[in-house]
């Protein structure tokens, strides 16, 4: 009697082809309960994602889903098809948040393979995908490119044809969309008086506060996004891994660091685009995340709304005021967890 394999072993490097379209399971409806749990797990304090009245006065439709929350949900959909057999998630580029996601919206994800390159060892390769998140109306709410190092099924199989996509260094400010009017911004309620004109290119901001990540918290957060990557959950299996223990999902680092950035960037709560992102080092339970930011650029989007291009650097177990980043050879400091380049909306001076 023959047996049929019904479980999903995930795709290996040989399974990916440029131009391939992957429609991911499972659609997820986001509710106000998701909003509350995300806030509890990340410590988010940005006013437009805390107060429905503030959000509406600022020009948003109401209490929206934090863009990073939507990003993690869309990312989570892709894991069973793209990164179940991944060695590492290497980076992000050309991320665009196109319209607000509201409680009650249902998100699904579709990815296109846009590149691949086998590594010199012959055991792994890098796969580039462009993922689009769509709502229940079929409207695009976000899109981004990421690249992943994936194991080969058979290290002896012939090398695949190389195709490396050309990606923009940053999303141009002229192409930013989805920003609100910010005409009736309540500075007392937002907790900050600082506007676009108060920030200078090259300025560095120490976000001061730290947050220690615990085992239960990071696993609940990762489950919230329906991310099934083995490295975050399988305590027994990870004993034989490179680190010998579970790894915290990189999205936890991004969201916690962004929440810490409230102290210094309290009016820059809405992410408009992701220019680049690198997970420079691993985070484990009981590590403490700190963060600092550098202003890379600024732009005027309307009479009342501007944008800051920011580099957010998350570090672990070290003083963020030391501004750890890279050495003279371009290598990341061992304390650096995340190097995240993004655009955020911010009100302009009245």
Functional labels for PLM-detected ranges:
Residues 2-90, 142, 152-274, 330-339, ...:
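Hot-dog-fold acyl-thioester-processing enzymes
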Residues 2-18, 101-179, 183-184, 285, ...:
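HotDog/MaoC-like acyl-thioester-processing domains
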Residues 38, 92, 107-111, 127-131, ...:
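Short, structured motif recognition centered on aromatic/hydrophobic residues
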Residues 61-65, 97-102, 161, 280-285:
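Short amphipathic alpha-helical patches
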Residues 94-95, 136, 187, 276, ...:
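Short linear motifs in intrinsically disordered/low-complexity regions
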Residues 88-99, 114-115, 270-281, 296:
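A cross-kingdom feature marking solvent-exposed beta-strand/loop segments within repeated
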């Amino acid at each position: 009697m023959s047996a049929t394999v019904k479980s999903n072993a995930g795709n290996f490097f040989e399974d990916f082809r440029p131009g391939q379209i992957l429609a991911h399971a499972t659609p997820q409806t986001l509710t106000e309960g998701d909003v509350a749990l995300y806030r509890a797990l990340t410590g988010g304090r940005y006013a437009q994602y805390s107060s429905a009245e503030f959000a509406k006065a600022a020009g948003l439709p109401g209490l929206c889903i934090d863009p990073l929350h939507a990003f993690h949900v869309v990312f989570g959909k892709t894991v069973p098809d793209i990164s179940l057999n991944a060695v590492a998630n290497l980076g992000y580029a050309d991320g665009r948040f196109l319209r607000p996601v509201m409680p009650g919206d249902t998100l699904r994800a579709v990815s296109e393979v846009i590149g691949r390159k086998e590594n010199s060892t012959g055991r792994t390769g890098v796969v580039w995908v462009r993922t689009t998140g769509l709502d229940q109306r079929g409207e695009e709410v976000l899109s981004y490119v990421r690249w992943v190092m994936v194991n080969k099924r058979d290290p002896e199989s012939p090398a695949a044809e190389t195709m490396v996509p050309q990606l923009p260094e940053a999303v141009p400010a002229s192409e930013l969309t989805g920003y609100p009017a910010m005409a009736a911004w309540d500075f007392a309620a937002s907790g900050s008086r600082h506007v676009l004109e108060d920030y200078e290119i090259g300025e560095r901001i120490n976000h001061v506060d730290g947050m220690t990540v615990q085992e239960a918290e990071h696993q609940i957060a990762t489950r919230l996004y329906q991310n099934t990557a083995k490295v975050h959950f399988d305590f027994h299996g990870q004993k034989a891994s490179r680190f010998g223990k579970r790894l915290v999902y990189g999205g936890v680092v991004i969201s916690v660091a962004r929440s810490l950035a409230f102290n210094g960037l309290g009016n820059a709560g809405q992410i408009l685009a992701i220019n680049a992102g690198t997970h420079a080092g691993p985070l484990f339970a009981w590590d403490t995340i700190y963060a600092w930011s550098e202003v890379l650029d600024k732009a005027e989007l309307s009479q009342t709304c501007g944008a800051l291009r920011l580099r957010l650097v998350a570090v672990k177990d070290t003083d963020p005021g030391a501004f750890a980043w890279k050495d003279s050879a371009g290598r990341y400091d061992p304390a650096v967890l995340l190097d995240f380049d993004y655009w955020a909306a911010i009100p302009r001076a009245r």
